[in-house]
Amino acid sequence: MPYIPHTPDDTKEMLEAIGAQDIQDLFDEIPASLQYAGFQNIPAGINEMEMLKEAQNQAQKNRNGICFIGAGCYEHHIPAAVWDIASRGEFLTAYTPYQAEASQGTLQLLYEYQTMICELTGMEVSNASMYDGATALAEAVLMAVRLNKHSKTNRVLIAGTVHPFYRETIETIVRNQHIEVITLPFDEQQGITNLGSLNQYTGEDITALVIAQPNFFGCLEQVDKMTSWAHHNKTISVACVNPTSLALLKPPGSWGEHGVDIVCGEGQPLGSPMASGGPYFGFLSTRMAHVRQMPGRIIGRTVDKDGKTGFSLTLQAREQHIRRAKATSNICTNQGLLVTAATIYMSLLGPEGLSQVATQCHQNTHELITALTQIEGVELAFKAPFFHEALIKLNQPVQSVLQQLADAGIAGGYAPEQHYPQLANTLLVCATEVRTAEDIAKYAKTLKTIMSKRGA
């Protein structure tokens, strides 16, 4: 036990005090067969310099490929200042700001974050974040069920174009809460929700409708028609959106005749790296009339007794603070550090910078699709407009193509066949603002070579 800071004399004195001969006597009740006999094949310890050299040698084995994968996690440029600021001790090691008078900096940052999310989504109030996009959507569904007092069925319509992992998360969370989830089919020519299937439920008791924009395939849904349908059917509408797209597209608060009721999504594109799947954060915003049913924490601005502006945890109807049965959520925390990075990211870029990022993503993906669909055996799978990722169809087995692309140093996309069997040999590709013309040209050239092998 070399990590224990006792000198040999300290150890001897303590052993004598308890009548033990040596340290091993402390473990004599453990059978010898269960005692540690030393790790096998573990080399002797090395010093720091040797360790750094070994780490460098191992790091050189990594392959830094060009990434064209999206599917819910996107490679964006993150200004160096974002994590330089977010890593300051005041943010990095701070705990939940329960003591408002000692946490004004953190509280103001969260308040500014909420304001920015409301500006992006066109809504009136935002919470201080959720775990990730999937849990944010699941919580939004639960919130919608609580809000819809007219509905007696707890039936929720979810577009089949919503991210498959998000739909799985919803099923997991609501399965035992007497909520029926109905998946709407999509048009296999257009790649968007089949409005005919939605209209079949007109006049029926439907509690909520979940819409994705852009959807999992990157396509742009007919959000105005779907939102208006929900309003006329007395159904709570929930929008699951990509925050980057909101710098270009109409905000959900303006969809249809009256806008949606709840907006949520994945915050990873706003300053969080693609760190093996997390940690990320989810955002959720709504109208002020619904604020009492919003999960998580909400930061408010107020004035103290001396007339000075201050910030505090205004609403936090969580199971930690009130009766569990009355809580709006049993999630006990949020993703404050990732929200800090997102707030800094949005502040640094500003509206114009966010718009430039979204525009470049859109342009790059269109250039990518144009280049790839000129290759024999490659075609665009759907006809609907798309934002910054799209589905292509190949005349060869997609897994073989992906492996050959990987061998050439290209992460070529995501194969959705595992979620949609009817989409065999299709590939979901994405090109954000970090992809260059040279990257796109390399992908197209490599894919052309791969596709030509079949006819050779």
UniProtKB/Swiss-Prot annotation:
The keyword Oxidoreductase applies. Gene3D superfamilies: Aspartate Aminotransferase, domain 1, Type I PLP-dependent aspartate aminotransferase-like (Major domain). It holds the Pfam family GDC-P. One of its GO terms (molecular function) is glycine dehydrogenase (decarboxylating) activity. It is an enzyme of class 1 (oxidoreductase). The keyword Lipid metabolism does not apply. Keywords: Oxidoreductase. It comes from the Bacteria. Its EC number is 1.4.4.2. GO terms for biological process: glycine decarboxylation via glycine cleavage system; nucleoside metabolic process. It catalyses: N(6)-[(R)-lipoyl]-L-lysyl-[glycine-cleavage complex H protein] + glycine + H(+) = N(6)-[(R)-S(8)-aminomethyldihydrolipoyl]-L-lysyl-[glycine-cleavage complex H protein] + CO2. The glycine cleavage system is composed of four proteins: P, T, L and H. In this organism, the P 'protein' is a heterodimer of two subunits. Belongs to the GcvP family. N-terminal subunit subfamily. This is Probable glycine dehydrogenase (decarboxylating) subunit 1. It comes from Legionella pneumophila subsp. pneumophila (strain Philadelphia 1 / ATCC 33152 / DSM 7513).
